[in-house]
Curated annotation (Swiss-Prot):
It is found in: Nucleus; Cytoplasm; Cell projection, Axon; Nucleus, PML body. InterPro entries: RING_finger_E3_ligase, Znf_RING, Znf_RING/FYVE/PHD. One of its GO terms (biological process) is protein K48-linked ubiquitination. It holds the Pfam family zf-RING_2. A zinc finger (RING-type) spans 614-655. Disulfide bonds: none annotated. It comes from Mus musculus. This is E3 ubiquitin-protein ligase RNF6.
């Protein structure tokens, strides 16, 4: 009796399960049909709007009503973009608001070499930009500067009424600073030249002095960018940073540090004339982005030079200008470099000891170009991401002006470097230790190629994602090193970086990602202080372990790209990864995809004789379906193939490159 009851009960449950399964499949088929019907009825503009903002979803998993709501919401955001501060969809809203102004900025950047001396400006919500171009057609030298001011509180006159401590400058600097006592903008662009070093290790630079360089600086707070996604803490309101500035040590002038030091200054030399740009730093963190076209000599100085001052000369004027707090001369041979710089103190500057470490970033793009020959050979440029984090032992009391302390710092100098190469990215981690201060440096070199002016790179392109993945990995490694440092100190005060880094690299993936997550959380807590670091180059490699990557950090990189909050995205429109690297993910841009032909599927005629199944979703075509045809004549649902082509550049069926058939004109 009992066995029969159990058998009947089991059969009843099985039939109920099968019925539910059939009902679920039927509902999914209905949702798929409604999905395709919705896509078929969309105009080209509405389809691109939803596709570009990742609103299409997956067939069968989203209803047509939800799709319609997404479309209406996107249109509302687009219509209200001038003053929209809605938080309903921060990433999409921000992207829509910045689109028109970003396009105008990019158009100007694409043509600045032909425009001569031109100034352009624009406003977009709480962001304003001002760009100045200076071109010398005869010599081929050019320079430009760009200011992007971000004021989250919309306080245009934030600079007024602030206390500041002056930095001793030359007479020209003082005159220029007095001419601009108050500015309606919260931050200023720092423009300067890269001058060849005349120090002991930079004598080779004297042969190529005076390369005209335009600085391209973007100053702004990254509330929604690096400050959140990278786990970088925000600067507290009472604390400010000081941008490294040029001073004249021959007059005995030094940086004077007050309780709230806000002024910096730099020079730009062009055709023998020097102009100055004042840098004001408010209580918001800075992220300068500097673009310097130039050609200068090579400096082989190590990652930390013991003498704290480098003398520079100008070819035209010959005036000695000394740069405080910078420990190397920057070199670039037709290359493009990006430096993410972490905070550290200027030498000879009063400094308040910190009890914790702190991550602060600065991105610098430098584009090298030979000014001696217009027919110079094109070289594949490279990006260098230089991330640094420093830690001061708690309770350490130091007098920055003490000669004995500086002697101890030099005597306690210790360096070690670990190098690895993966996926076309050359990566180096260096460890620098002085008495009381420990610094970790993560340097990443990314191969790039300059694309033509007609080409357009999407902010969400694979190149940017790859670059930001490397940034994320670098921050994760530095944070992990800072986290394991106390434990390593307890075991051995003399432990070198290779031992710590090898321990991190050889750990399990789960442990690695856990370390990154905990370290990012630690770093995002209140850790103040430290000035902006000077530009530096990686030290010579000594070892080559293979470093593991944090998946959690990689995921965050994608979210940063999609949000479009990093100012580097504007510059990265001009770059793609080098064709020779081995990055496995390559897709087409949205413009290239849109240039492929489309049509509607018809049941009659030729279509009845051709294939009726989309090879991507394995679904039958229905009359009215929008199809996109590749140059190889294979066809697919438009939404299926667009998603495929965003990550791949080949046909899903024949695997032939899509752009090989003459579609390269799509740019």
């Amino acid at each position: 009796m009992d066995p029969s009851r159990s058998r009947s009960g089991g059969s009843g449950e099985e039939s109920s399960f099968q019925e539910n399964e059939r009902r679920w499949q039927q509902e999914r088929l209905h949702r798929e049909e409604a999905y395709y019907q919705f896509i078929n009825e969309l105009s080209d503009e509405d389809y691109r709007l939803m596709r570009d903002h990742n609103l299409l979803g997956t067939p069968g998993e989203i209803t047509s009503e939800e799709l319609q709501q997404r479309l209406e919401r996107a249109k509302e955001q687009l219509a209200s973009q001038p003053g929209s501060d809605s938080a309903a969809s921060d990433g999409d809203s921000e992207s829509l608001r910045a689109h028109s102004d970003e396009d105008s900025l990019l158009r100007w950047l694409n043509t600045f070499r032909r425009t001569g001396n031109v100034t352009r400006s624009g406003q977009n919500g709480n962001q304003s930009w001002r760009a100045v171009s200076r071109t010398n057609p005869n010599s081929g030298e050019f320079g430009f500067s760009l200011e992007i001011h971000i004021n989250p509180d919309n306080r245009g006159s934030e600079m007024h009424g602030e206390d500041s401590t002056d930095i001793p400058l030359s007479g020209v600097n003082r005159e220029h600073r007095q001419q601009r006592p108050s500015s309606p903008v919260a931050r200023r662009t720092r423009s300067q030249t890269s001058m060849s070093s005349s120090g002991p290790r930079g004598r080779r630079g004297a042969r190529r002095q005076g390369s005209v360089q335009g600085s391209f600086a973007t100053l702004g707070r990254l509330r929604n960018g690096i400050g959140v996604a990278l786990g970088v803490p925000r600067v507290s309101a009472p604390r400010t940073n000081v941008i490294n500035s040029h001073t004249n040590q021959s007059d005995g002038s030094t940086l004077r540090q007050g309780g709230r030091q806000r002024f910096g200054a730099a020079h730009i030399w062009e055709n023998g004339a020097r102009s100055n740009v004042t840098v004001r730093n408010t209580n918001q963190r800075l992220e300068p982005i500097r673009l310097r076209p130039a050609f200068s000599s090579r400096s082989r100085s190590p990652i930390q030079r013991q003498n704290g001052t480098v003398h520079h000369n100008s070819q035209r004027q010959g005036r000695p200008v000394q740069q405080t707090g910078r420990n190397r001369s920057v070199r670039h041979r037709g290359v493009t470099r990006v430096f993410l710089e972490q905070g550290r103190e200027h030498r000879g500057t009063d400094y308040t000891p910190l009890s914790n470490s702190r991550l602060v970033s600065r991105i610098t793009v430098e584009e090298g170009e030979s000014s001696r020959s217009s027919a110079a050979t094109q070289r594949h440029p490279a990006i260098t991401l230089d991330l640094q984090v420093r830690r001061i032992r708690p309770g350490e009391t130091r007098d920055r002006d003490s000669i004995a302390n500086r002697t101890r710092s030099r005597a306690g100098l210790a360096e070690s470097t670990v190098e690895s190469t993966s996926g076309g990215f050359h990566r180096t981690i260096s460890h620098l230790e002085r008495s009381g201060v420990r610094t970790y440096v993560s340097t990443i070199t990314v191969p790039l190629r300059r694309i033509s002016e007609n080409d357009v790179v999407e902010p969400s392109s694979v190149a940017l994602r790859s670059i930001l993945r490397q940034i994320m990995t670098g921050f994760g490694e530095l944070s992990s090193l800072m986290e394991v440092e106390p434990a390593s100190e307890n075991q051995s005060n003399g432990q070198r970086l290779p031992e710590v880094y090898l321990e991190l690299s050889n750990g399990d993936a789960a442990d690695d990602s856990g370390q990154h997550g905990r370290a990012s959380s630690q770093a995002s807590q209140a850790q103040d202080g430290a000035e902006m670091l000077a530009v530096r180059e990686p030290a010579p490699p000594q070892a080559r372990p293979s470093g593991s990557r944090s998946r959690r950090q990689l995921g965050r990189a994608d979210s940063v790209v999609e949000a479009g909050t990093l100012p580097i995205l504007r510059l990265a429109h001009f770059f793609l990864l080098n064709e020779g690297d081995d990055d496995p993910i390559r897709g087409l841009t949205k413009e290239q995809i849109d240039n492929l032909s489309t049509r509607s599927y018809e049941q009659d005629g030729v279509d009845s004789e051709l294939g009726k199944v989309c090879s991507v979703c394995i679904s039958d075509y229905v009359a009215g379906n929008k199809l996109r045809q590749l140059p190889c004549l294979h066809e697919f649902h438009i939404h299926c193939i667009d998603r495929w082509l965003s990550e791949n550049c080949t046909c899903p069926v024949c695997r032939r490159p899509v752009l090989e058939f003459g579609a390269t004109s799509s740019g």
